[in-house]
Regions:
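Bacterial N-terminal signal peptides
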Residues: 6-16
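Short boundary/loop segments of OB/S1/cold-shock single-stranded nucleic-acid-binding domains
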Residues: 20-36
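Conserved hydrophobic positions within beta-strands
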Residues: 40-42
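Short aromatic-glycine-enriched beta-strand elements
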Residues: 48-57
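A short macromolecule-binding patch
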Residues: 61-71
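Short nucleic-acid-contacting surface segments enriched for D/E, G, S/T with interspersed K/R
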Residues: 76-95
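OB-fold/S1-family single-stranded nucleic acid-binding modules
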Residues: 100-141
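Glycine- and charge-enriched low-complexity intrinsically disordered segments
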Residues: 138-150
């Protein structure tokens, strides 16, 4: 009986880990070899677990959504508190990040993926508020993607 419970627990953990890995397979959703830099004003920010969404309006009128997932995984007040105060309506920010892949590219890896894909979604590498010292950036990657030939 005890062995059966241990086996069931191991199966559950393996299944949960693979599901979480598929959901957070960053390279399948964002093209890490094609970064863009955009500058615009914050229209709104939504702190929703497990993602934080920043909605920007660029000077040319284009609307962008920034999927700031790393922030929402850091749930201590030292990180979220300043970010909530820094990214208020009207704040001008510069975001450098990776643009989301097309629906066809995502379905190459996840054939049953059915969500809509907003082509103006960016996964940030860095965010800087214009005019003062607020900034945030991911640490350098230990194993950066190989972008040769892309």
């Amino acid at each position: 009986m005890r062995q059966e419970l241990v086996m069931l627990a191991m199966l559950y953990i393996a299944t949960a880990a693979s599901s979480a890995s598929a959901h957070h397979s960053h390279p399948y959703f964002y093209d890490e070899c094609k970064s863009i830099t955009i500058e615009g004003r914050v229209e709104r920010v939504e702190f929703k677990d497990p993602h934080t969404w920043i909605f920007l309006r660029l000077d040319d009128g284009a609307a962008y959504t920034v999927d700031w997932a790393p922030l929402s995984r850091l749930t201590n007040d030292r990180v979220i508190g300043p970010a909530k105060n820094a990214l208020v309506f009207g704040a001008r920010v510069v975001v450098t990040g990776n643009r989301i892949r097309t629906l066809a590219q995502i379905r190459e890896h996840f054939p049953d993926f059915t969500s809509d894909v907003n082509p103006n979604t960016v996964d940030p590498i860095s965010i800087r508020r214009v005019g003062d010292s607020f900034s945030w950036a991911l640490p350098p990657r230990a194993n950066p993607p190989n972008c040769n030939g892309k």
